[in-house]
UniProtKB/Swiss-Prot annotation:
Single GO cellular component term: plasma membrane
S-S bridge residues: none
The protein's name in its UniProt record: Serine/threonine transporter SstT
Subcellular location field: Cell inner membrane
Segments passing through the bilayer: 24-44, 48-68, 82-102, 142-162, 194-214, 218-238, 292-312, 319-339, 365-385
Domain of life (superkingdom): Bacteria
Topological relation to the membrane, as annotated: Multi-pass membrane protein
Gene name for this UniProt entry: sstT
SUPFAM superfamilies, A to Z: Proton glutamate symport protein
Amino acid sequence: MAFGKSLFHAIGRVSLVRQIAAGLALGIVIGSVSPQLGLAAGLFGSLFVGALKAVAPVLVFILVAATIAQHQKGNKAHIRPIIVLYLIGTFSAALTAVIAGMVFPTHIVLAGAGDVSAAPPSGIVEVLKSLLMNLVANPINAIANANYIGILAWALVLGAALRNHGSDVTRQVVADLAEAVSTVVKWIIRFAPLGIFGLVSSTIAETGFGALAGYAKLLAVLLGCMVFIALVVNPAIVWWKIRRNPYPLVFTCLRESGVYAFFTRSSAANIPVNMALAKKLGLHEDTYSISIPLGATVNMGGAAITITVLAMAAAYTQGIQVDFATALLLSLVATVSACGASGVAGGSLLLIPLACSLFGISNDVAMQVVAVGFIIGVIQDSAETALNSSTDVLFTAAADLGRQRNRAE
């Protein structure tokens, strides 16, 4: 017993990133050396994906409803320009990911994907019709059937109603439920190393190394989009606000915020770091004390990239050709879906099924794509969080410095 406890304590002291990396490496070895054992280990992957499928609909519903219910009206701290920058940045990231997904179409190997047939929509009209019908689905059925469009719609409506008519106690109960569900998600994510081990070992046993090559290309597209946003798009947005060389500010935010966020992999955990940096930059305290925590929820360029690229990869893998109008709609959906993803472990990955539903892709296939996201998540999630969190303080600084420039003129 003492040995078992000490072993668990020793494992607990190892970071989740290293545990996932170890599970990934062990899965490759087992799947290559003993395919039969690799296939048997696939049970761990199936259990992990099953747990994600069970919690994802509840997570989206509770989290979005709580976020809307807790929103404060009548804030006079110059927040609106920053929110505009957050939305512009997130939509620009989603649009960049759409273009990259079309220029570099990626096919990924999904276990059992050949057994699932997805009927591709004929075009934007059919997609919009399906979207509208899903909006008015029964909320209980929407959660039970993982209809993420319906879940999002009902969560927005319920959150708005609670904000306007609910008591403080009721809103706090919803917030506590959101925190509880987020905690359950974190517990499930703690089993990610074991789940990744099972997924990788069974994938290698079934398909060989072709799947990992597909994942490498997928990761290259994801990281390429994030680097492009961080070093090209975001500086252009900052220049638009401050009208001077944006790169000193950009590199300061990447160095003093992005590096921390890369290793913590949590925008929420990086809020104190961003607060300290905002104070160091001499920004307006009444502004950044609100915009930094808000940005940890709604400023989600990295999440929008992840959702868009993986959803398009799922579409191409299922043989669905994506027209530009549908891709543009995907950008909008990814922008809305990304809001609220950062404070939750694996949040952006768990919102991929919502985007996949635009293409008529089943929830089973979508959750296999989520599993692929966890396989590459050792790097993807770190880079995504670094982009998200560093942009929180970057856009806050840009808006504040832009306001100072306008006042001086």
